[in-house]
Amino acid sequence: MAENQTTAAPETAAEPTAGRVTRIQGSVIDVEFPVGHLPDIYNALTVELANTGVHEEGETTKKITLEVEQHLGDSTVRTVALKPTDGLVRGATVYDTGGPISVPVGDVTKGHVFDVSGNILNKKADETVKVTERWPIHRNPPAFDQLESKTQMFETGIKVIDLLTPYVQGGKIGLFGGAGVGKTVLIQEMIQRVAQNHGGVSVFAGVGERTREGNDLIGEMDEAGVLEKTALVFGQMDEQPGTRLRVPLTALTMAEYFRDVQNQDVLLFIDNIFRFTQAGSEVSTLLGRMPSAVGYQPNLADEMGALQERITSTRGHSITSLQAIYVPADDYTDPAPATTFAHLDATTELSRDIASKGIYPAVDPLSSTSRILDPRYVGQAHYDCANRVKAILQRNKELQDIIALIGIDELGEEDKTTVNRARKIEQFLGQNFYVAEKFTGRPGSYVPADETIEAFTRICDGVYDDVPEQAFSGIGGIDDLEKKWHDMQKEYGA
């Protein structure tokens, strides 16, 4: 709510405090202010430059936003620029806005793409956007007595997720994986499913990823009709590190308004949280801080905690966050993914080995976890089914070395049955996505959690032992399985 704000940016500044640039080193700018008028940490400063080359249409000046990061003494602050500093000179006049960067909030954000400062990037020439309220991006997390204590499952309709790594309503979910295993596709699919099946509001933060992917995402969401229910904030890999560091806060501020003022459940997507950490490392180096382990910033845990603590459920309303996490060189001991682990309620690990088998989503069923995979939250039937599936897959994994040496025919009957069921389970954990329809030609499917549990219980019980492995590939629920098996019998004359 409004009382949760740290420092509200004033609507009008009659006499903004002016300072001057004393030092420029890349995107780090030192600014001197009059004695007694030093801006607070995280205040936004602006400097306007005339005749600096290319401007936005209709603009005669280039405005640069600076964010105060350090007080150096002698009435001087050290700032980080959020835009390129080409053309900036010593002695240029800098104005203190009197508060942190503030961004538009509310219904005006839906269907629009914003930069870190809240400027609309996809506004049509004839479109008039009236911003009635702005919130600062630096805010305190909800007080402890405002937090929601109830825990419940968030149904996605994706079999492998609902069964083995159920998501928490108002929780934080990490999508782990190396390059090219499907993190962004899974996020796009979740945006589609939230809009279609839950009618919720989504906020997307594109942090340090490819601009092409951002354009593709906007186009696909527009085609699917979900763009009007989504606010998007982008700070892609060609942006300044200061911008990439603050984009998640801009998106989170918009999500907090929907939760706290409009009393809505919100899904916040961050792609990619590793780039947030990476940007923090770059800013830390620019500011001259001593690096910590593997060259990361010494305040890595503090920066991550400040972001993650704001992503939570208040009484009756929630922000559920899905965060894609790039794992450098597939090394899970790297400080960036390791620091993120501590804040997550569920982890979905995407495996290159499973992707190489052509099974998508390439979720590793044995490595992915969820804190609510517990009878108290999901029920005994769900818990027992998930454990049976994991036990079969684990036993199959243990038998692979033996099979490679002597072949599957030399196994005992019980192990043969386990391997055959495991292969069917692996195929059945795959699923067609709505966002991939135009690439695969196969329609996407939504499988309710109850149907998922029933189907996998039947497989574990041996009901489908006579059904070939191929029948389990590329389908949705039980009805799809039985229809495909019936069609295969007709085709092969069985």
Curated annotation (Swiss-Prot):
List of residues binding ATP: 177-184
Species in which this protein is naturally found: Bifidobacterium adolescentis (strain ATCC 15703 / DSM 20083 / NCTC 11814 / E194a)
Any one GO molecular function term: proton-transporting ATP synthase activity, rotational mechanism
Protein name in UniProt: ATP synthase subunit beta
Self-association state and partner proteins as the record states: F-type ATPases have 2 components, CF(1) - the catalytic core - and CF(0) - the membrane proton channel. CF(1) has five subunits: alpha(3), beta(3), gamma(1), delta(1), epsilon(1). CF(0) has three main subunits: a(1), b(2) and c(9-12). The alpha and beta chains form an alternating ring which encloses part of the gamma chain. CF(1) is attached to CF(0) by a central stalk formed by the gamma and epsilon chains, while a peripheral stalk is formed by the delta and b chains.
Pfam families the record matches: ATP-synt_ab, ATP-synt_ab_N, ATP-synt_VA_C
SUPFAM superfamilies per record: C-terminal domain of alpha and beta subunits of F1 ATP synthase, N-terminal domain of alpha and beta subunits of F1 ATP synthase, P-loop containing nucleoside triphosphate hydrolases
Bilayer topology: Peripheral membrane protein
PANTHER family from the UniProt entry: ATP SYNTHASE (PTHR15184), ATP SYNTHASE SUBUNIT BETA, MITOCHONDRIAL (PTHR15184:SF71)
Function comment: Produces ATP from ADP in the presence of a proton gradient across the membrane. The catalytic sites are hosted primarily by the beta subunits.
Compartments it resides in: Cell membrane
Catalysed conversion reaction: ATP + H2O + 4 H(+)(in) = ADP + phosphate + 5 H(+)(out)
Gene3D superfamilies membership: 2.40.10.170, Bovine Mitochondrial F1-atpase, Atp Synthase Beta Chain, Chain D, domain 3, P-loop containing nucleotide triphosphate hydrolases
Lineage start: Bacteria, Bacillati, Actinomycetota, Actinomycetes, Bifidobacteriales
Stretches that traverse the bilayer: none
Primary localization class, coarse: membrane
